[in-house]
Amino acid sequence: MKILVAVAVFFLVSTQLFAEEIGANDDLNYWSDWSDSDQIKEAMPEPFEHLLQRIARRPKPQQFFGLMGKRDADSSIEKQVALLKALYGHGQISHKRHKTDSFVGLMGKRALNSVAYERSAMQNYERRRK
């Protein structure tokens, strides 16, 4: 354990000395040179600029994946238009929603009535014990 601490201290001291040697060679005053934007642009390497542009770029709307999954921009607009037409009497919705006694959410399937839910929970518990 003491050897590990000694190696860590040696590493930190050597990096500090190396950083001081590099800092002594630089004659730049970073606080006064912020007005020279041309000098800053020239000093910035190409890959670093590219990385900053990638970070600053915002995703396109069709690249957004929400909780509902991937959405296609064209089909969602068509679905909205069809829904508006159906609501205002210009068309029909062909698919109907069938209500059941269970709800499937993010946490899994849940029963809407508590008696069926308790019964299924007890059956699952007894099935696991066997």
UniProtKB/Swiss-Prot annotation:
Role according to the record: Tachykinins are active peptides which excite neurons, evoke behavioral responses, are potent vasodilators and secretagogues, and contract (directly or indirectly) many smooth muscles.
Residues the record marks as site: Cleavage: P59, K60, Q63, F64, F65, G66, L67
One Gene Ontology cellular component annotation held by this UniProt entry: axon
Localization of this protein: Secreted
Leader sequence residues: 1-19
Pfam short name (any one): Tachykinin
Top-rank taxon: Eukaryota
One GO BP annotation of this record: chemical synaptic transmission
GO terms for MF: substance K receptor binding; substance P receptor binding
Coiled coil: none
Family in the record: Belongs to the tachykinin family.
Protein name: Protachykinin-1
PROSITE patterns (UniProt xref): TACHYKININ (PS00267)
PTM sites of type Methionine amide: M68, M107
Gene: Tac1
InterPro entries from the UniProt entry: Tachy_Neuro_lke_CS, Tachykinin_dom, Tachykinin_fam
Keywords: Amidation, Cleavage on pair of basic residues, Neuropeptide, Neurotransmitter, Secreted, Signal
Propeptide: 20-56
Keyword Signal: yes
Phylogenetic classification of the source organism: Eukaryota, Metazoa, Chordata, Craniata, Vertebrata
